[in-house]
Swiss-Prot record:
It catalyses: beta-D-ribopyranose = beta-D-ribofuranose. Keywords: Carbohydrate metabolism, Cytoplasm, Isomerase. Substrate binds at residues 28, 106, 128-130. It comes from Pasteurella multocida (strain Pm70). The active site is at residue 20. One of its GO terms (cellular component) is cytosol. Its main location: cytoplasm. This is D-ribose pyranase. It is found in: Cytoplasm.
């Protein structure tokens, strides 16, 4: 059995196969997932697992160099945004790099998900709790 934090085999496999600049989307329960993109559905019930729990599990195994977030989160979900930005700042410290954060419209965000290697669906039921993470290299 693995002894790292991330135990979900399909999610662990997706992260293990990411190359430099590949993207992985973590989303709330409502984001549309394109049929051609691999879906890692972790949602069990409303709020389980939360978006932030899912984010924290993913970044235990993924080196992140940049992120995209929907602009609308600033107004519609500031609590999640604040927690997410704090988590990204902590991740920068752990990784020893700067993580570029870009804001785009929600419509543009949905377009960008079409290029993701996979989309990880959480049980989060709050608006705009979504992020696209781009893989970096830890050297």
């Amino acid at each position: 059995m693995k002894k790292t934090a991330l135990l979900n085999a399909p999610l662990s496999q997706v992260i293990a196969t990411l190359g430099h600049t590949d993207s992985l989307t973590i989303c709330d329960a409502g984001l549309p997932i394109p049929k051609q993109i691999e879906r890692v559905d972790l949602a069990l019930s409303a709020g389980v697992p939360s978006f932030l729990q899912t984010f924290h599990a993913v970044v235990t195994e993924m080196f992140v160099e940049r992120a995209i977030i929907a602009e609308e989160i600033k107004e519609k979900n500031p609590k999640i945004l604040t927690a997410l930005l704090n988590s990204l700042a902590q991740l920068e410290q752990q990784q020893g790099n700067q993580i570029e954060v870009q804001y785009v419209s929600h419509d543009m965000f949905k377009t960008y998900t079409h290029a993701s290697k996979a989309i990880v669906r959480s049980g989060e039921c709050s608006p705009y709790a979504n992020i696209i993470l781009y893989s970096g290299v830890p050297f």
